[in-house]
Amino acid sequence: MGAAVTLNRIKIETGIADIRDKYMVLDFNYPEYNRAVRFAEESYMYYYETSPGEIKPKFCLIDGMSIDHCSSFIVPEFAKQYVLIHGEPCSSFKFRPGSLIYYQNEVTPEYIKDLKYATDYIASGQRCHFIKKDYLLGDSDSVAKCCSKTNTKHCPKIFNNNYKTEHCDDFMTGFCRNDPGNPNCLEWLRVKRKPAMSTYSDICSKHMDARYCSEFIRIIRPDYFTFGDTALYVFCNDHKGNRNCWCANYPKSNSGDKYLGPRVCWLHECTDESRDRKWLYYNQDVQRTRCKYVGCTINVNSLALKNSQAELTSNCTRTTSAVGDVHPGEPVVNDKIKLPTWLGASITLVVISVIFYFISIYSRPKIKTNDINVRRR
């Protein structure tokens, strides 16, 4: 039978990135039980926020400790703007009270709780947590008055900032479901917060024919077009007989086989300029701007009928102006006449010069000379 697990050594090491962070290295007689428990001991005086609107010192307030320990880490001038609230649960070494044990890897609240004799050395508490006074609001009625802008006289900034933060999202979600055409709801939607877009996507999936859904589609395209496409798909799937849906959800028929190209370019429900873009999927909206079609007007001056035949002649080719939406692509660049580059001209000049040089050499008359006899002794 093996020997019992015993603790051989405890070593405290200081962190590198933050001097407040430390490691308690526990060495056992069996290496597989070795642990490095990370914890913090607060030493800073806070004059800044750890996250927007709140300060969370690295201090675990255990039972029997005064709450003054928490406030001792904030400079007095800064502390006047904040209040202490009930913080998250934490664990602290009793022999180093106030230390904050980090929960990570194998070290979890359950792991500490299951340790034998853990309560003799580790205590539970709440982490110090301060929140800005401006972030507090009394009751739901006050939230309603601030978020609906009924009375903003005494509203904190976070509830009176034109919906730039998420603090009014919960209220506006319910409020706008009951009154989606309210100007404040449309203002909330124009900020393009995802809760707002999701809310209107759900509303327009039941009431796409309402005017506020036109504004909804205008706002979300092109960045968040999926919210609108989802609403249109659900609405048209539930209202297949609605003629407005015939471009997005055309009734099954063979008539479409007679035409070339996507139906968004020839179907009246798609091509009519009076059509609201909300009845088109985003890709159809883009496609319609690229459609090119030619129309003409037929005037019948005379019509000849012979037995069961009618003969009509019309010249439609005279009207060549294209009608429809302007193509959003890049403008066409006319091809320019390509002129020879300086490099090409230089090479050509050198070649011509060499040719003329050799021609001039070989065209000269031969120089007459006298033969000289040389005899070597």
Swiss-Prot record:
> How does the record classify its membrane topology?
Single-pass type II membrane protein
Q: Where are the transmembrane segments?
A: 342-362
What InterPro entries does the annotation carry?
Pox_virus_G9/A16
Q: Which residues lie on this side of the membrane: Intravirion?
A: 363-377
N-myristoyl glycine: lipidated where? G2
One Pfam family matching this protein: Pox_G9-A16
- Which compartment or compartments is the protein found in? Virion membrane
Post-translational modification note: Most cysteines are linked by disulfide bonds. They are created by the viral disulfide bond formation pathway, a poxvirus-specific redox pathway that operates on the cytoplasmic side of the MV membranes.
Gene Ontology biological process terms from the UniProt entry: DNA-templated transcription termination; membrane fusion involved in viral entry into host cell; symbiont entry into host cell
GO cellular component terms, A-Z: membrane; viral envelope; virion membrane
A GO MF annotation of the entry reads: DNA binding
Write out the entry's keywords from A to Z.
Answer: ATP-binding, Disulfide bond, DNA-binding, Fusion of virus membrane with host membrane, Helicase, Hydrolase, Late protein, Lipoprotein, Membrane, Myristate, Nucleotide-binding, Phosphoprotein, Signal-anchor, Transcription, Transcription regulation, Transcription termination, Transmembrane, Transmembrane helix, Viral envelope protein, Viral penetration into host cytoplasm, Virion, Virus entry into host cell
| Ranges in the topological domain labelled Virion surface | 2-341
Q: Which family does it belong to?
A: Belongs to the orthopoxvirus OPG143 family.
- Role summary: Envelope protein part of the entry-fusion complex responsible for the virus membrane fusion with host cell membrane during virus entry. Also plays a role in cell-cell fusion (syncytium formation).
Record's subunit section: Part of a stable entry-fusion complex (EFC) which is at least composed of proteins OPG143, OPG147, OPG155, OPG086, OPG094, OPG107, OPG104, and OPG099. Formation of the viral membrane is necessary for the assembly of the complex. Interacts with OPG094. Interacts with OPG153.
What is this protein's name?
Virion membrane protein OPG143
Native source species: Monkeypox virus
Recite the lineage of the species.
Viruses, Varidnaviria, Bamfordvirae, Nucleocytoviricota, Pokkesviricetes
